[in-house]
């Protein structure tokens, strides 16, 4: 069993546990996906156990020790997103990769006020960019709604519904920001 696979399993166990601790931030669909990721990770641990016997708790402890930082908040790990980008191909092939990758949406809530926009950039330029982003997100949401018609399995349907929710929430946030800039 490669070290990279073990680290990926540790990371999956750690993220599933931390996301489930923040259940109030999760919608039902995401919570189901995280539970499924937890089940999948436990299955991977059983597969790995013939090489290095470990429990769910061992995998989480290994990840905490590897990090050697305060584990009280996911907000304190800017390197987590980069780590998720560098995990093994086996993990990227997992259908639960998207909810893990979208974890950054839960950990990077910004309270920055519109009046703290960097000096040198005019509001109309910012508004134009935000409106362009919003229109692209609306197009993505439309394409996702069309994709639902051709879905054969429930896992893909859950992922599409989850990503549509993210699109809609982001669109609303951008429109709210645009209104506050006007």
Swiss-Prot record:
**Superkingdom of this entry's organism?**
Viruses
Question: What GO biological process term is on the record, naming one?
Answer: exit of virus from host cell nucleus through nuclear pore
Q: Name one Pfam family in it.
A: Flu_C_NS2
For this UniProt record, the keywords arranged alphabetically read as follows:
Host nucleus, Host-virus interaction, Transport, Virion
UniProt signal peptide: none
Coordinates of motif Nuclear export signal in the sequence? 96-105, 122-132
What is one GO cellular-component annotation here?
virion component
The family database entries (InterPro entries) matched by this protein are listed as:
Flu_C_NS2, Flu_NS2
- Where mainly found? virion
> Which chain positions lie within coiled-coil regions?
none
Q: Where in the cell is it found?
A: Virion; Host nucleus
Task: State if ATP-binding is listed as a keyword.
Answer: no
Family affiliation: Belongs to the influenza viruses NEP family.
- What does the UniProt function comment say about this protein? Mediates the nuclear export of encapsidated genomic RNAs (ribonucleoproteins, RNPs). Acts as an adapter between viral RNPs complexes and the nuclear export machinery of the cell. Possesses no intrinsic RNA-binding activity, but includes a C-terminal M1-binding domain. This domain is believed to allow recognition of RNPs bound to the protein M1.
What is said about its interaction partners and assembly?
Answer: Interacts with protein M1. May interact with host nucleoporin RAB/HRB and exportin XPO1/CRM1.
Q: Spell out the protein name for this chain.
A: Nuclear export protein
């Amino acid at each position: 069993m490669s070290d990279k696979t073990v680290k990926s399993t540790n990371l999956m166990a750690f993220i599933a546990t931390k996301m489930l601790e923040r259940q109030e931030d999760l919608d039902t669909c995401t919570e189901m996906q995280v539970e499924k990721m937890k089940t999948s990770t436990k299955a991977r641990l059983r597969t790995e156990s013939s090489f290095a016997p470990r429990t769910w708790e061992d995998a989480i402890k290994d990840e905490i020790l590897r990090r050697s930082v305060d584990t009280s908040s996911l907000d304190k790990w800017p390197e987590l997103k980069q780590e998720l980008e560098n995990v093994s191909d086996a993990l990227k092939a997992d259908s639960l990769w998207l909810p893990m990758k979208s974890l950054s949406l839960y950990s990077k809530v910004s309270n920055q006020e519109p009046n703290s926009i960097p000096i040198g950039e005019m509001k109309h330029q910012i508004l134009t960019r935000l409106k362009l982003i919003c229109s692209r997100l609306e197009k993505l949401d439309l394409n996702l709604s069309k994709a639902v018609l051709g879905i054969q399995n429930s896992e893909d349907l859950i992922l599409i519904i989850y990503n549509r929710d993210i699109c809609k929430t982001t669109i609303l946030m951008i429109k709210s920001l645009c209104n506050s800039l006007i």
